[in-house]
């Protein structure tokens, strides 16, 4: 007996050695005033009574809480706990500590969502058909020949454009129209969240139109082509004969009976069943698609009017006709397949007609459309998947009914508003009840594209809360949001490269990955599915994968009922989709707006970014910010400090840890002058290779350790991270990964504005690097003035080194006084760093 006890004790001790625990968080971080709940997972039956927040920059414990809720076992995790720190609102950078287990680092500030809604548009551009800016090539130029039309069978119609649906190259009005509406709504509600960095064709370069509007127009132009005449609506381009392996769109070898890459079919909506493999689909009418046409044309006309007035008028005139098709042919329209039984099995349609009707009411003011919208809305008060355990693929689509919100938001009848708010609340409540026992409050059924359902419910929660003022479901809203960014069993973001410095899907089911061309950046992957669904699908596996991809990296964390795999051949959980990605634009832009409002920042970020770093302030304002950097040179300090004082100009100084330690008197003089003093790293590390900016030369741990060490030194001068959240990287050289790591620390990279070449004041004759070319001070000054005359210096960060090598005897900083006075005469204002940037990271 003693031997048995000793043996069992040894086994327990042995297992404990390999047991582990984790804290799951939102990797982006949190805005200050929002629901903030982390989840603790342990392979041991651990008791948790409290947890702490530790300030990463000071190492001090700043918060202790007993707001701990045990949630039981989950898969291989014997204990899970919800750790609620919603009442902690102080901006900063933290980690959670619970039972000796530490979470990853995360920030709390008003800017964690800045730029994220724009970021997901990268995937939409990658999915473009007709001309693909990612490939810089055209594709599918022969689309398409007509099917199922009584008099036009086989005829050609120009339906080029739009987006490929996912890794396959099919195009569906069902998903594309929903994607268009989601982006329209996001821009209508939160226009300041979107910027202009790309042309209308998707290639880099501003065109004076917000990028999301470019994307909306790309989609609506295609949708307009899919409705060439009154009553003539098309539902789909291509079919599952496309599914012949991974391929590139410009050389698509799919054969639809006319030879490879020689045109694809486009399917007319006749309101009758069409092919589904060896069977027929369950189409009963045209209304589900017709309603989508109508809502897109109506809202699209409003949004596009300032940018494309003629096109706006054109689609405005089509909206009522499209809705009439749905009135004449009530019922659902499903998609077509030829080889397999897999289709979009949309069964509902009154939601689409409700939204189409209410948008026509908004466009025309005609009350008959509101009456119709209410009639349709009452036929489906709650989208049926909400609270259910299962549903067929896209059976209840779109996954949330925007019509309910639009009626409640725009009716003047208080009773009607209350009715449709109750409808919204009922769907949320059902999902909430289903998720109550789940450690992550995830009440979403584990069906195909569960992340799309998660995003839809998140959107409904936001809209209900903001319109009703009822915050009863705010914790679930936060859990759904955080699920998408890593507060889930697997600890991964569900959006490719967001955040880039974090954990996100890397082995996605994507043509770009299979062809080694890149990643579907910004794409929202399908998300977890029931284990039974995964096991039943054809061709899906996690073993026949690409080199260097682990077969089941998340095996340890699989909850059991559902699975998620970061594997290229798992198209059920790891394939990005176009409609799901577009649906992110509203919640992400909303949280950006909410975060900025909470911290008093300007609603619109007018700064210009490069690889995540700010390289220019607002280009419309005649403001200039002087920035100075140094690692070990100080010969210009006296002149620069005295000149700034004489001219009453505030500059921004960025020093390495070595500089702070070596030249404390200079630092103190600069501080006394009221200038910004920030970090230039501690050890002046080179982050990326000169020959390849994407090639990192430091690890995340090395970067973080170096930055924290630098701020530790700065703290001796009374400079906290909150006082100095902006830093210039060593060598003024970085990439988007470094920017992401910095943002995780609550820091924002700033860099000089290219063009003037003032940063080249460190060069000297005979430099050892042949690539470096000596620039005299006169040349630098003249070039600056030429650049100003041609381009202006609006929003420029003009950089001058605090000192240079002794080999350079011609010191450019000696022209500082002349630069200031000359540019002031030209009407420029020299402003502080904080005033230039306009963010509030403190």
Would you name each region that the model predicts?
Residues 175, 180-187, 223-225, 234-235, ...:
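Structural recognition of the beta-strand scaffold that forms the well-ordered cores
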Residues 639, 661-665, 686-799, 803-829, ...:
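Catalytic domains of cell-wall/extracellular-matrix polysaccharide-remodeling enzymes
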Residues 27-104, 110, 125-178, 185-186, ...:
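Aromatic (Trp/Tyr) and acidic
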Residues 201-209:
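Acidic, glycine-anchored loop motifs typical of Ca2+
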Residues 212-237:
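Carboxylate/His-rich catalytic cores and anion/metal-binding grooves
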Residues 290, 294-304, 312-362, 391-408:
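Aromatic-lined, polymer-binding surfaces characteristic
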């Amino acid at each position: 007996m003693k031997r048995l006890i000793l043996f069992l004790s040894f086994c327990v001790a042995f297992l404990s050695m390999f047991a582990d625990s984790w804290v799951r968080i939102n990797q982006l971080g949190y805005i200050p005033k929002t629901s903030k709940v982390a989840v603790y997972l342990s392979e041991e039956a651990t008791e948790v009574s409290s947890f702490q927040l530790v300030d990463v920059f000071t190492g001090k414990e700043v918060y202790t809480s007993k707001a701990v809720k045990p949630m039981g076992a989950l898969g291989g995790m014997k204990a899970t706990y919800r750790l609620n720190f919603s009442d902690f609102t102080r901006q900063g950078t933290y980690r959670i500590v619970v039972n000796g287990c530490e979470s990853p680092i995360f920030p709390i500030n008003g800017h964690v969502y800045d730029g994220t809604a724009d970021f997901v548009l990268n995937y939409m551009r990658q999915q473009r058909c007709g001309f693909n800016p990612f490939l810089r090539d055209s594709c599918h130029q022969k689309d398409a020949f007509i099917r199922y039309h009584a008099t036009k069978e086989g005829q050609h119609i120009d339906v080029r454009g739009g987006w490929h649906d996912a890794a396959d190259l099919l195009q569906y009005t069902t998903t594309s129209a929903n994607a268009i509406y989601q982006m329209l709504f996001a821009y209508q509600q939160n226009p300041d969240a979107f910027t202009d960095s790309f042309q209308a064709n998707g290639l880099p370069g501003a065109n004076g139109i917000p990028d999301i509007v470019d994307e909306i127009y790309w989609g609506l132009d295609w949708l307009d082509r899919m409705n060439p005449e009154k009553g003539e609506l098309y539902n789909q381009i291509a079919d599952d004969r496309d599914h012949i392996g991974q391929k590139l769109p410009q050389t698509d070898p799919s054969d639809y009976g006319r030879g490879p890459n020689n045109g694809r079919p486009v399917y007319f909506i006749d309101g009758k069943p069409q092919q589904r493999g060896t069977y027929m689909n369950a189409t009963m009418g045209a209304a589900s698609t017709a309603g989508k046409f109508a809502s897109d044309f109506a809202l699209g006309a409003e949004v596009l009017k300032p940018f494309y007035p003629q096109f706006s008028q054109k689609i405005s005139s089509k909206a009522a006709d499209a809705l009439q098709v749905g009135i004449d042919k009530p019922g659902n329209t499903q998609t077509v397949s030829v080889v397999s039984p897999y289709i979009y099995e949309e069964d509902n349609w009154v939601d689409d007609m409700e939204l189409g009707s209410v948008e026509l009411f908004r466009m025309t003011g005609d009350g008959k459309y509101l009456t119709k919208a209410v009639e349709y809305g009452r036929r489906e008060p709650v989208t049926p998947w909400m609270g259910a355990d299962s549903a067929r693929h896209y059976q209840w689509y779109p996954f949330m009914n925007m019509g309910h919100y639009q009626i409640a938001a725009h009716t003047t009848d208080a009773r009607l508003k209350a009715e449709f708010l109750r409808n919204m609340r009922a769907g949320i409540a059902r999902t909430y009840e289903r998720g109550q026992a789940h450690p992550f409050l995830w009440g979403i059924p584990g069906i195909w594209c569960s992340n799309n359902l998660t995003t839809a419910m998140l959107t409904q929660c936001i809209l209900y809360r903001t319109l009703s003022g009822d915050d009863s479901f705010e914790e679930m809203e936060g859990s759904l949001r955080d699920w998408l960014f890593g507060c889930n069993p697997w600890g991964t973001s569900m959006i490719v490269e967001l955040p880039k410095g974090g954990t996100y899907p890397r082995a996605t089911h994507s043509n770009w990955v299979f062809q080694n061309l890149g990643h579907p950046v910004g794409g929202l992957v399908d998300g977890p599915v029931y284990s039974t669904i995964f096991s039943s699908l054809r061709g899906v596996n996690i073993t026949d994968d690409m080199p260097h991809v682990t077969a089941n990296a998340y095996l340890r964390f699989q909850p059991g009922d559902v699975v998620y795999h970061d594997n290229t051949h798992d198209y059920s959980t790891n394939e990005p989709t176009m409609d799901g990605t577009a649906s992110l634009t509203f919640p992400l832009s909303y949280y950006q707006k909410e975060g900025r409002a909470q911290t008093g920042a300007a609603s619109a970020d007018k700064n210009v970014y490069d690889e995540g770093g700010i390289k220019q302030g607002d280009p419309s304002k005649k403001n200039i910010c002087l920035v100075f950097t140094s690692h070990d040179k100080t010969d210009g300090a006296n002149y620069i400090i005295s000149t700034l004082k004489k001219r009453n100009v505030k500059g921004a100084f960025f020093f390495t840890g070595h500089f702070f330690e070596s030249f404390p008197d200079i630092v103190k003089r600069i501080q006394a002058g009221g200038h910004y003093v920030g970090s230039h790293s501690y050890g002046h590390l080179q982050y990326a290779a000169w020959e390849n900016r994407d090639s990192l030369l430091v690890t995340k741990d090395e970067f973080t350790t170096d930055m924290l060490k630098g701020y530790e030194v700065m703290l001796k001068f009374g400079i906290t991270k909150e006082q100095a959240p902006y830093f210039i990287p060593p060598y003024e050289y970085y990439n988007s990964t470094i920017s992401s790591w910095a943002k995780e620390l609550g820091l924002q990279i700033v860099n000089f504005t290219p063009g003037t070449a003032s940063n080249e004041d460190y060069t000297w004759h005979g430099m050892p690097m042949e690539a470096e070319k000596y620039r005299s001070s006169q040349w630098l000054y003249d070039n600056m003035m030429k650049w100003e005359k041609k381009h202006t210096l609006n929003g420029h960060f003009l950089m001058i080194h605090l000192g240079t090598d002794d080999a350079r005897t011609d010191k450019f900083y000696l022209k500082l006084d002349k630069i200031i006075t000359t540019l002031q005469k030209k009407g420029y204002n020299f402003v502080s760093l904080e005033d230039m940037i306009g963010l509030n990271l403190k």
